[in-house]
């Protein structure tokens, strides 16, 4: 059953999910949860260690099980990992249980936000070296091309390139409240 008070934030790494998420949750009076942190707590080890020791299939299985638990909750803002929507089962679970919001940023802005980060595997080459700014932007553009068709199936989209964080949270809060009112009205009319 779809809970309109279960909000899922999606978007590329650096789009603002971890920054906007807790502020949005506070604004709505909801709890905030980061899916990757929940997976780490369940597994008792980091995402990097899960991939290294158990493989991607084990990680994806944990991801789905964690989402199934979260799907039973209400009044929660959930920050999703950048690739979770590529899994069809996860995508359907998210779409059927809550409101999906895409925090959209351009490859150029994402590059500016991410180029000095050292903890992101996507910013390293196959040999482990740090990618150049141009290589980072190219990798982001390639991954966005692959992921964006799913991102764009979100219920709501918020562009995060040039907005201040507070303005983004205010705009998103208004969009969510309107969306929930419309959805509630539609559900009432269907009965």
Swiss-Prot record:
<dbReference type="InterPro" id="IPR023000">
    <property type="entry name" value="Shikimate_kinase_CS"/>
</dbReference>
<keyword id="KW-0028">Amino-acid biosynthesis</keyword>
<protein>
    <recommendedName>
        <fullName>Shikimate kinase</fullName>
        <ecNumber>2.7.1.71</ecNumber>
    </recommendedName>
</protein>
<keyword id="KW-0479">Metal-binding</keyword>
<comment type="pathway">
    <text>Metabolic intermediate biosynthesis; chorismate biosynthesis; chorismate from D-erythrose 4-phosphate and phosphoenolpyruvate: step 5/7.</text>
</comment>
<feature type="binding site">
    <location>
        <position position="147"/>
    </location>
    <ligand>
        <name>substrate</name>
    </ligand>
</feature>
<dbReference type="GO" id="GO:0005524">
    <property type="term" value="F:ATP binding"/>
</dbReference>
<dbReference type="GO" id="GO:0004765">
    <property type="term" value="F:shikimate kinase activity"/>
</dbReference>
<feature type="binding site">
    <location>
        <position position="18"/>
    </location>
    <ligand>
        <name>Mg(2+)</name>
    </ligand>
</feature>
<dbReference type="InterPro" id="IPR000623">
    <property type="entry name" value="Shikimate_kinase/TSH1"/>
</dbReference>
<dbReference type="Pfam" id="PF01202">
    <property type="entry name" value="SKI"/>
</dbReference>
<comment type="subunit">
    <text>Monomer.</text>
</comment>
<dbReference type="InterPro" id="IPR031322">
    <property type="entry name" value="Shikimate/glucono_kinase"/>
</dbReference>
<keyword id="KW-0547">Nucleotide-binding</keyword>
<keyword id="KW-0418">Kinase</keyword>
<keyword id="KW-0460">Magnesium</keyword>
<comment type="similarity">
    <text>Belongs to the shikimate kinase family.</text>
</comment>
<feature type="binding site">
    <location>
        <position position="120"/>
    </location>
    <ligand>
        <name>ATP</name>
    </ligand>
</feature>
<dbReference type="GO" id="GO:0005829">
    <property type="term" value="C:cytosol"/>
</dbReference>
<comment type="function">
    <text>Catalyzes the specific phosphorylation of the 3-hydroxyl group of shikimic acid using ATP as a cosubstrate.</text>
</comment>
<feature type="binding site">
    <location>
        <position position="36"/>
    </location>
    <ligand>
        <name>substrate</name>
    </ligand>
</feature>
<feature type="binding site">
    <location>
        <position position="82"/>
    </location>
    <ligand>
        <name>substrate</name>
    </ligand>
</feature>
<dbReference type="GO" id="GO:0009423">
    <property type="term" value="P:chorismate biosynthetic process"/>
</dbReference>
<dbReference type="GO" id="GO:0009073">
    <property type="term" value="P:aromatic amino acid family biosynthetic process"/>
</dbReference>
<dbReference type="GO" id="GO:0000287">
    <property type="term" value="F:magnesium ion binding"/>
</dbReference>
<dbReference type="InterPro" id="IPR027417">
    <property type="entry name" value="P-loop_NTPase"/>
</dbReference>
<keyword id="KW-0057">Aromatic amino acid biosynthesis</keyword>
<feature type="binding site">
    <location>
        <position position="60"/>
    </location>
    <ligand>
        <name>substrate</name>
    </ligand>
</feature>
<dbReference type="GO" id="GO:0008652">
    <property type="term" value="P:amino acid biosynthetic process"/>
</dbReference>
<keyword id="KW-0067">ATP-binding</keyword>
<feature type="binding site">
    <location>
        <begin position="14"/>
        <end position="19"/>
    </location>
    <ligand>
        <name>ATP</name>
    </ligand>
</feature>
<keyword id="KW-0963">Cytoplasm</keyword>
<keyword id="KW-0808">Transferase</keyword>
